[in-house]
Structures are given as structure tokens and as C-alpha cells.
Design a protein with these regions (language model features):
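P-loop NTPase Walker A phosphate-binding motif
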Residues: 282-306
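Short, hydrophobic-biased segments on the C-terminal half of alpha helices
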Residues: 65-72, 292
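Phosphate-binding P-loop
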Residues: 266-274
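Intrinsically disordered, charged and Pro/Gly-enriched terminal/linker segments
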Residues: 16-27, 33-40, 52-62, 66, ...
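Hydrophobic anchor at the beta1->P-loop junction of P-loop NTPases
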Residues: 279
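Gly/Thr-rich phosphate-binding loop signature of adenosyl cofactor/nucleotide-binding cores
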Residues: 9, 31
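A short acidic, leucine-rich amphipathic alpha-helix
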Residues: 46-48
Length: 306
């Protein structure tokens, strides 16, 4: 069940529910409300207050029964169960819950110094965030705190991951995450600093400096303030160097892959048999760094062929 961006709901058999199958917007919003609390009961009183706030209780309960019947018809009779005086959505994968779980996971990795894993988890979460959480009724007050919490958690995770990517020297990841963070908040100095560091780290000094000028202009126009001392310091650092390249960070988060690669190389060396190993992954995932770390451990040199 995807609630972020356009609604997508699949039945247990994998078939997609077509938008025309939803009878009313209230039916869809009932599902959205239950899905955001997947596995937890939502009281009938809370549902009535959220979806039928200006309707007397008798009519509201009748509308709820109709919407519930429609949902069970579409999803299956056991998909939504009564629990005391509430309703609970059972056995459903929901993107909002998955996103919050990934945000918690990324935070745990970072807390224990596993920055590479934190970045990878954030990139996984990016694929889930296809848009904001919205109710069918654009004025629905119940959806506001849910949307604000999801967006705040996502922005924080992406910004943190962007900064970790800079520390790791994963500049292309840093740029992609920084742009994503800036799309969510055009006044985020943290995002601008990530982009400045990313461009400078790739030797694109002019783009780094232009990013600072854009930051300065946006802050002045939108907030009436100047860039912070931290942003000004980074700007000066880039100005006074040919290109900004942070020190090489410790190699973390790839211990298992490095061990596997070294074991494979040792076996080839012991038997005297040549071989080829392929490392697959998206740009900026750390493949080149992994090869260099393996070569350093083996006392070998790496030749890059474009």
C-alpha cells in the first residue's frame, strides 16, 4: 500500500485496485487513516471525528459502516478487523511505516559510526518517497500532523545522509541527497553546504561558489538573513584552495565485502589461477573505494581504465 504520492493499493493476490473502484473519497480516506496506524486499532470515535466531524453520530456511524463494507469488499473480509470499539488494518505493507522504520534504522547506524550503512538506508528510503502524504479531502485536518511528521523525518534523514556522504568522500551521493534535501526546503543551509562540499570535492569549484551565491540570495529574499558563519567559513575555504577535498575518511560499512574480496584474491594467488570479479552497484556506492582498499591490503596497485 503506497500512501506517499499517488495512492496505490494491491490486494493480497497482487492485483492493483483501480481508482474507479473506490466509491467515495471518504472510503479512501478511511483506508489511509487505518493504514497510517497499520497494526494498531483506531477508535471509532477518532475515525468519526477525523472523517465526519460535522455530521451527527448516528449518520456518521452509518457512513462509516458503508465505507468499511466497501473496503472489505475490495480488500477482503479479514483485511480490517474490529477490536473493541475500534478498527485495525491487518497484515499490510505500508510505505509510510516502511519509511519511518528506515529512518530509525539509519539513525541507529549513524549512532554506532556506520555512516556508509546510514547513507545506503537513506537511499533506499528515497525510493519510497514518491510524494507527500495527502488525504482525498485537501482540507482534512487529521492528515496535517501525519504529513508534517513524515516530511520532517524524511528531510532529517536525507540531510544527515548527505553530510555523512561528504565525510565518506561519496561526493556524487552527497550531491544527489543534497539536491533532494534542497527540493524539500529551499532555505536549508545544511543542504547548500553539502552541495558546496560535493562540487568542491569533485573539483568543480565554480559550481561550489555559485551554490553559495544562490544560498545567499535565497536566504536574503526568503528570510531576510545572511548565511551563517559556518557557511561563510566553507565559502572562504573553497575560495582559498584550488579545490576542496576533504580528508579520506576511515573505510567503514564494507567489512564483509572487503573480506570476501580479499579471500577471493588470496585463493587466486595461492592456486596461481587468474580470474575476474565484478562489483555491481549504483554510482557513488563505494565500489572504487572498495577496490582501492583491497589493493592497499594486498600491496597491489590499481590501474583505472576509462
Amino acid at each position: 500500500m503506497r500512501l506517499l504520492g499517488p495512492l496505490q493499493v494491491r490486494r493480497a493476490d497482487g492485483s492493483l485496485i483501480h481508482p474507479r473502484e473506490w466509491r467515495t473519497g471518504k472510503t479512501v480516506d478511511l483506508l489511509r487513516l487505518l493504514a497510517t496506524r497499520s497494526g494498531e486499532a483506531v477508535s471509532v470515535d477518532e475515525i468519526l471525528e477525523a472523517l465526519w466531524p460535522n455530521v451527527d453520530e448516528h449518520r456518521g456511524r452509518g457512513s462509516l459502516r458503508n465505507a468499511l463494507g466497501q473496503l472489505r469488499k475490495l480488500l477482503g473480509q479479514t483485511a480490517i478487523e474490529r477490536q473493541r470499539d475500534g478498527l485495525v488494518l491487518r497484515d499490510a505493507w505500508v510505505d509510510t511505516a516502511a519509511l519511518l522504520k528506515l529512518a530509525d534504522e539509519a539513525r541507529r547506524h549513524a549512532r554506532h559510526g556506520r555512516l556508509a550503512l546510514a547513507v545506503n538506508v537513506a537511499r533506499e528510503a528515497e525510493a519510497l518517497h514518491l510524494g507527500e502524504f495527502r488525504a482525498h479531502d485537501p482540507d482534512a485536518l487529521w492528515a496535517v500532523p501525519i504529513r508534517e511528521n513524515l516530511e520532517a523525518r524524511f528531510r532529517e534523514m536525507v540531510l544527515d545522509a548527505a553530510e555523512y556522504a561528504v565525510e565518506l568522500g561519496w561526493m556524487r551521493d552527497a550531491l544527489e541527497l543534497g539536491h533532494r534535501a534542497l527540493d524539500a526546503d529551499t532555505t536549508s543551509e545544511r543542504a547548500y553546504r553539502v552541495l558546496m562540499s560535493g562540487f568542491a570535492g569533485l573539483g568543480e569549484t565554480e559550481r561550489a561558489l555559485r551554490t553559495y551565491e544562490r544560498c545567499r540570495a535565497v536566504l536574503a529574499e526568503e528570510l531576510g538573513i545572511d548565511p551563517s558563519a559556518q557557511s561563510r567559513s566553507l565559502h572562504l575555504e573553497i575560495l582559498t584552495s584550488e579545490h576542496h577535498e576533504p580528508p579520506v575518511a576511515p573505510f567503514t560499512g564494507r567489512d564483509r565485502e572487503l573480506s570476501t574480496l580479499l579471500t577471493w584474491c588470496a585463493q587466486r594467488r595461492a592456486t596461481g589461477t587468474p580470474g575476474v570479479v565484478y562489483l555491481s552497484g549504483p554510482d557513488g556506492s563505494g565500489r572504487t573505494r572498495l577496490v582501492h582498499e583491497a589493493a592497499r591490503s594486498l600491496g597491489a596497485e590499481v590501474e583505472v581504465v576509462e
